[in-house]
């Protein structure tokens, strides 16, 4: 049974992903509600190391990009999957969403860079 790790799994899209993947996969959710701080990259990487799919959903400024690079480095050359969750906020950035949108754009660009290396 494939093992899927999802950050930000307790609400919104994260909760929907848990519901969907739980049908056929073992799901591990990481969020503040169960004591995980995605800013602690080492703790997250310990949970992700033995899984098959990592869904990088939770937002915390730089942490999503740092997690992408850390998991990619750990999994390089292995048959594993990383899914990064972006946002429509990156299109037509509104003032109140600028910090969020900028970090999601950074994640998107980091994703493209990692994809080019595969």
What role is predicted for each listed range?
Residues 4-20:
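N-terminal Rossmann NAD(P)H-binding glycine-rich loop of SDR-like oxidoreductase domains
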Residues 26-46, 59-66:
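Adenosine-cofactor binding site in Rossmann-like domains, unifying the SAM/SAH pocket
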Residues 6-7, 55-57, 81-87:
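Structural signature of the Rossmann-like NAD(P)-dependent dehydrogenase/reductase core
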Residues 63, 76, 80-118:
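Catalytic loop of short-chain dehydrogenase/reductase
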Residues 11, 59-61, 88:
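Flexible cofactor-recognition loop at the NAD(P)H-binding site
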Residues 4-6, 24-32, 107:
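Short, hydrophobic beta-strand segments that form beta-sheet elements in well-ordered domains
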């Amino acid at each position: 049974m494939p093992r899927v790790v999802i950050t930000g799994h307790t609400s919104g899209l994260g909760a929907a992903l848990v519901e969907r993947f739980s049908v056929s996969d073992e799901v591990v959710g990481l969020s503040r509600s169960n004591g995980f701080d995605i800013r602690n990259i080492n703790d997250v990487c310990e949970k992700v190391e033995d899984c098959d799919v990592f869904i990088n959903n939770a937002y915390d400024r730089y942490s999503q990009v740092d997690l992408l690079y850390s998991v990619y480095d750990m999994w390089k050359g292995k048959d594993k999957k990383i899914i990064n969750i972006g946002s429509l906020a990156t299109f037509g950035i509104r003032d109140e969403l600028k910090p969020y949108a900028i970090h999601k754009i950074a994640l998107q660009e980091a994703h493209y860079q990692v994809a080019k290396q595969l």
